[in-house]
């Protein structure tokens, strides 16, 4: 049997990372949950593999979507978010309950893809503007100079004022300058016939017509030089970038690299014998609407049609009441990879406080450090904080690592309030300090429910 041809792997491309390298990258920020990390690492690697497959077979290879099962605060969202950041993939998170709270059914579920495309377009536009920044800045300075000294001024005068603009000396000087008129005409938006869900604002239509004829409506305004530079820089950048190219790049990124994270999917599962028939119908309707989106369909957006066949969907839920088997069988089939995330232990809490590159202890120490106050946590303090977090999670409600945020906020409240008056001091947080600050709250569980 002949092997399928593949193209060469580009080692600099994030898609070329091996599963073990991806897991190592995730380990820098997330503690534990090896099964979930391994699942997303394989999914990402397979995405890269598909790109290197030649011929028609490439289009037949679809991503194996993932269902993450675990309590809140155990790292489900963070794993997906870090994965997207690692690969610079367009990423969009949405709660499945958003489509039931206001009775969303049918085409409204497609807003997920429209929002994802919007994110990708804005990201590509930002990158493109960075590339033309020098030219755009020069043109912006020229326009501001014309308002300040006129078109007929000498080169010496222009150079002198240009230096003042660059140094910020004229930031608070008021000028009168012509800028693009961004006031909406008529307001609102309308549906495009034959394109469900693809709405177009009146302003957008006018803008498109203006572009087609090379004209843009302008308005003369009075503003400060600093404000004018910001507005004109944006205008000149828009003129220099290729809008059509940006849109095509964004759509291509969404179609091939997009990641959609659907949280709280357990909340739209139909629980047997629940007795609430209307809500069951609503939930089942949302599930049915999600099916084509996850399986692969074409969604019409204001930027053009977008195929969802190769977008990676990661769904997650706690499944305390409902079970994964309560989801529609068709939806279960479209989420073939299931991973269960473990509840966090005391040891996990200690690692979360210390090990990640952006750990909570490092964050709080850096924040207080800006006031020239050194914050030091002893090992006994870390252990005590982790112990309290685990206890509250067990006795009140398990919110995972998020419990550490509430505990640290209460623990450091006085220090945060008085830090500006404590410059030059070094504060040591030990187990006794932790106990003094939190023991009264923890002994009163009713109070802890509201405070922690």
UniProtKB/Swiss-Prot annotation:
BP terms from Gene Ontology: protein unfolding; proteolysis involved in protein catabolic process
Key words, A-Z: ATP-binding, Chaperone, Cytoplasm, Nucleotide-binding
Positions contributing to ATP binding: 31, 73-78, 263, 330, 402
Domain of life: Bacteria
UniProt-listed Pfam families: AAA, AAA_2
Annotated coiled-coil segments of the chain: none
GO CC list: HslUV protease complex
InterPro entries assigned: AAA+_ATPase, ATP-dep_Clp_protease_ClpX, ATPase_AAA_core, Clp_ATPase_C, HslU, P-loop_NTPase
GO MF annotation list: ATP binding; ATP hydrolysis activity; peptidase activity; proteasome-activating activity
Chief location bin: cytoplasm
Matches recorded under Gene3D superfamilies: 1.10.8.60, P-loop containing nucleotide triphosphate hydrolases (3.40.50.300)
Compartments where found: Cytoplasm
Assembly: A double ring-shaped homohexamer of HslV is capped on each side by a ring-shaped HslU homohexamer. The assembly of the HslU/HslV complex is dependent on binding of ATP.
Family under the similarity heading: Belongs to the ClpX chaperone family. HslU subfamily.
Entry function: ATPase subunit of a proteasome-like degradation complex; this subunit has chaperone activity. The binding of ATP and its subsequent hydrolysis by HslU are essential for unfolding of protein substrates subsequently hydrolyzed by HslV. HslU recognizes the N-terminal part of its protein substrates and unfolds these before they are guided to HslV for hydrolysis.
Name this protein carries in UniProt: ATP-dependent protease ATPase subunit HslU
């Amino acid at each position: 049997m002949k092997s399928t041809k593949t193209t060469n792997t580009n080692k600099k491309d994030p898609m070329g990372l091996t599963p073990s390298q991806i897991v190592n990258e995730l380990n820098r920020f997330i503690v534990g949950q090896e099964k979930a990390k391994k699942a997303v690492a394989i999914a990402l690697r397979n995405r890269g593999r598909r790109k290197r497959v030649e011929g028609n077979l490439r289009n037949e290879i679809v991503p194996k979507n993932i269902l993450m099962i675990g309590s809140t605060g155990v790292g489900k969202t963070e794993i997906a978010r870090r994965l997207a950041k690692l690969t610079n993939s367009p990423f969009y998170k949405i709660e499945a309950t958003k489509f039931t709270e206001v009775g969303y059914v049918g085409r409204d579920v497609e807003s997920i893809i429209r929002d994802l495309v919007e994110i990708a377009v804005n990201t590509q536009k930002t990158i493109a503007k960075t590339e033309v920044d020098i030219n755009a800045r020069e043109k912006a300075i020229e326009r501001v100079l014309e308002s300040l000294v006129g078109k007929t001024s000498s080169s010496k005068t222009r150079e002198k004022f240009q230096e003042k603009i660059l140094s910020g000396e004229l930031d608070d000087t008021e000028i009168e300058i012509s800028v693009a008129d961004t006031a909406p005409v008529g307001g609102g938006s309308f549906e495009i016939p034959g394109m469900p869900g693809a709405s177009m604002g009146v302003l957008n239509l006018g803008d498109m017509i203006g572009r087609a004829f090379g004209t843009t409506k302008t308005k003369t305004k009075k503003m400060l030089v600093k404000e004018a530079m910001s507005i004109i820089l944006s205008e000149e950048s828009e003129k220099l970038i290729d809008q059509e190219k940006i849109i095509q790049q964004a759509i291509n990124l969404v179609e091939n690299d997009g990641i959609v994270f659907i949280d709280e999917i357990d909340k739209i599962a139909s629980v047997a014998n629940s007795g609430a028939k209307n809500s069951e119908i609503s939930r089942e309707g949302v599930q049915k609407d999600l099916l084509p989106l996850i399986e692969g369909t074409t969604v019409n957006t204001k930027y053009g049609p977008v195929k969802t066949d190769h977008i990676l969907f990661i769904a997650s839920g706690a499944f305390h009441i409902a079970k994964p088997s309560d989801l529609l069988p068709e939806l279960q089939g479209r989420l073939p990879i299931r991973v269960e995330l473990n509840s966090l232990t005391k040891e996990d809490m200690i690692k979360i406080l210390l090990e990640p590159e952006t750990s909570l202890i490092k964050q709080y120490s850096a924040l207080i450090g800006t006031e020239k106050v050194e914050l030091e946590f002893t090992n006994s303090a870390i252990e005590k904080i982790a112990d309290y977090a685990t206890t509250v999670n067990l006795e009140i409600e398990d919110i995972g690592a998020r419990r550490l945020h509430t505990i640290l906020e209460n623990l450091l409240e006085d220090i945060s309030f008085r830090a500006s008056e404590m410059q030059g001091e070094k504060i040591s947080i030990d187990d006794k300090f932790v106990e003094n600050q939190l023991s009264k709250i923890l002994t009163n569980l009713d109070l802890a429910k509201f405070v922690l």
